[in-house]
Amino acid sequence: MSDRNPLIDADRRADEDNTLRPQTLDDFVGQAAARANLKVFIEAAKVRGEALDHVLFVGPPGLGKTTLAQIMAKELGVNFRSTSGPVIAKAGDLAALLTNLEERDVLFIDEIHRLSPAVEEILYPAMEDFQLDLIIGEGPAARSVKIDLAKFTLVAATTRLGLLTTPLRDRFGIPVRLNFYTVEELEYIVRRGARIMQMGISSDGAREVARRSRGTPRIVGRLLRRVRDFALVAGADIIDRRIADEALSRLEVDNRGLDQLDRRYLNIIARNFGGGPVGIETIAAGLSEPRDAIEDIIEPYLIQQGFLQRTPRGRVLTAVAWQHLGLPAPAEIIQQSQYGLFMEDE
């Protein structure tokens, strides 16, 4: 047993969170195609001595959109400013941000789909012409003022590409879609995180944490810290598969990475609505969760793992979901599954 003090103070936890984040594109694990393209665009911008074109990251939460934005600023050697769509309440807030940017700085706006229409209108000329068009005064005394801005790079992130207006979406020269990570990529992240936290972990222990992390690095970091806590209290020098499994089971994360909320979602559709189809508003009411949270956080992983189908009539559970819940699937679901296997054989 190590003589390290398991009582870690808040400062160290904050440092640990920052250290777990990769600092360069070479350190960043996963998203190989996106990283390769970003390297080219960053290098080209540096050679030209110009600001990088505006970048839009699209994907579920926790896949590294903010981290990639920070890395891009570091690789470009410029300042990084960060905010989010809901924080920019009025045009003046955006104007204050933009006028404080220096040449080629990176401005990161998370949840850009939540910008108000008035703020979005101000953003168009800022992105395209690097100018602010502001109305000063009211009534007959009102006048239009143009303010020149430093040539900056806007890096934006969204989980809901469909909520972006076409004029805003078209102004991003570099759209980047991020996908869920493979178990192998997450396993590497787990081992790296364990080294940083000075905690031993076996190969099967790392894989157990990785495969139950919903394909998401942010969840990997959270689960690894909690598994580490269980291991320390148990007096273990190394996290093996048994310790990881016990810790994750106590955290109610099952062997497919589904947590309590995921299982409630599946059970509501299965037990209350016979497996669907059922509308999203009905599910949201049953879970007492907002629709956005369900569509952004719960459903993407369930769909990717084959538990759920979105149809014009509503959400429908697949045979995989019924099997995972340990419930008998309706006859039509079994028939569809058998028909799919038959078509594959053909």
UniProtKB/Swiss-Prot annotation:
Pfam families: AAA_lid_4 (PF17864), RuvB_C (PF05491), RuvB_N (PF05496). Keywords: ATP-binding, Cytoplasm, DNA damage, DNA recombination, DNA repair, DNA-binding, Hydrolase, Nucleotide-binding. One of its GO terms (molecular function) is four-way junction helicase activity. It catalyses: ATP + H2O = ADP + phosphate + H(+). One of its GO terms (biological process) is DNA repair. It is an enzyme of class 3 (hydrolase). It is found in: Cytoplasm. Its EC number is 3.6.4.-. CDD domains: AAA (cd00009). Residues 255-346 are annotated as: Head domain (RuvB-H). The keyword Hydrolase applies. Mg(2+) binds at residue 66. DNA binds at residues 291, 310, 315. Homohexamer. Forms an RuvA(8)-RuvB(12)-Holliday junction (HJ) complex. HJ DNA is sandwiched between 2 RuvA tetramers; dsDNA enters through RuvA and exits via RuvB. An RuvB hexamer assembles on each DNA strand where it exits the tetramer. Each RuvB hexamer is contacted by two RuvA subunits (via domain III) on 2 adjacent RuvB subunits; this complex drives branch migration. In the full resolvosome a probable DNA-RuvA(4)-RuvB(12)-RuvC(2) complex forms which resolves the HJ. Belongs to the RuvB family. This is Holliday junction branch migration complex subunit RuvB. The gene is ruvB.
